[in-house]
């Protein structure tokens, strides 16, 4: 063999070895890549499976809800149809075995109710055993005023009678001082001055004819009672007490607005 052929053979053997080496390394790389791809594929398949499991659990719950909603809807429609059937029977429709539509049933019901209300308004029932107790059905309605009852009248009349009795008793007790036509008692224009002394002192006794001024029962009409001549003719001449004159003088012409009282007081003052 020549040296040239030997060199060619050695180069070819080296190339084959390197090729075999590369070929052996390539399957290893391809195996590694396939393992990575398989691992990636397994990991990618796990997530969709979990999602599928979740999706499968959700429709189960929604299906139960749909079933319950359907049951409720069927029951509602059944009640609805039964109510319309009862209304059709109450209207006594006669369509040769055909049912009225829902709209026609409602229209007939409205017309029937309107006709009945008009009839009852024009022809009220006579001799009703039990009248309606609602306030809206009464003639006065809700704003009817309450009629005064006998009990309310008595409760109002009793305090009024008591007030009148007390007023009459007070006036009867005051008439012993203000009796006589000369100067009738008046709360606004009194005939005597409030500063003058009306009653005598305790040491001065009253005449037996008139009794004590404080005793209402023993009082006799002499000074201010009786007629005009008896009141100012005899009574003033027989009075021995000076305080009567002082009282009349102090009363004077200031506190007697009455014309008759004015002239009488002027006459007494002149005496």
From Swiss-Prot:
Give the UniProt entry's GO cellular component terms: nucleus
| InterPro entries per the UniProt record, alphabetical | bHLH_dom, bHLH_transcription_factors, HLH_DNA-bd_sf
Name its cellular compartments.
Nucleus
Question: Start and end of every bHLH domain?
Answer: 64-116
> Does this entry carry the keyword Transcription?
yes
Q: What happens when the protein's gene is inactivated? A: Morpholino knockdown of the protein causes severe truncation of pectoral fins at 72 hours post-fertilization.
Ranges for region Disordered: 17-49
Listed A to Z, the keywords are: Developmental protein, DNA-binding, Nucleus, Transcription, Transcription regulation
Principal subcellular localization? nucleus
One example of the protein's molecular function in GO is: DNA-binding transcription factor activity, RNA polymerase II-specific
Pfam families, sorted: HLH (PF00010)
Taxonomic superkingdom: Eukaryota
Sequence ranges of Acidic residues compositional bias: 22-38
GO biological processes: developmental process; pectoral fin development; regulation of transcription by RNA polymerase II
**Name of the protein in question:** Class A basic helix-loop-helix protein 9
Q: Which species is the source of this protein?
A: Danio rerio (Zebrafish)
Source organism phylogeny: Eukaryota, Metazoa, Chordata, Craniata, Vertebrata
């Amino acid at each position: 063999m020549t040296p040239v052929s030997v060199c060619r053979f050695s180069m070819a053997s080296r190339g084959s070895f390197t090729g075999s080496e590369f070929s052996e390394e390539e399957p290893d790389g391809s195996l590694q890549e396939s393992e990575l791809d398989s691992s990636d594929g397994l990991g990618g398949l796990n997530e969709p499976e979990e999602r599928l499991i979740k999706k499968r659990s959700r429709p189960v719950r929604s299906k139960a809800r749909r079933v319950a909603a359907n049951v409720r809807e069927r029951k509602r429609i059944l009640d609805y149809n039964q109510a319309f059937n009862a209304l059709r029977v109450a209207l006594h429709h006669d369509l040769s075995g055909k049912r009225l539509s829902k709209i026609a049933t409602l229209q007939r019901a409205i017309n029937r109710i309107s006709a009945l209300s008009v009839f009852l308004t024009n022809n009220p029932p006579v001799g009703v055993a039990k009248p309606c107790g609602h306030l809206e059905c009464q003639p006065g309605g809700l704003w009817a005023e309450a009629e005064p009852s006998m009990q309310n009248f008595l409760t109002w009349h009793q305090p009024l009678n008591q007030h009148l009795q007390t007023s009459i008793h007070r006036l009867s007790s005051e008439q012993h001082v203000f009796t006589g036509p000369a100067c009738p008692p008046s709360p606004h224009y009194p005939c005597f001055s409030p500063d003058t002394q009306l009653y005598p002192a305790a040491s001065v006794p009253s005449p037996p004819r008139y009794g004590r001024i404080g005793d209402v029962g023993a009082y006799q009409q002499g000074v201010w009672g009786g007629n005009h001549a008896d009141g100012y003719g005899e009574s003033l001449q027989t009075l021995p007490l000076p305080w009567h004159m002082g009282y009349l003088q102090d009363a004077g012409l200031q506190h007697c607005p009455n014309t008759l009282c004015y002239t009488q007081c002027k006459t007494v003052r002149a005496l």
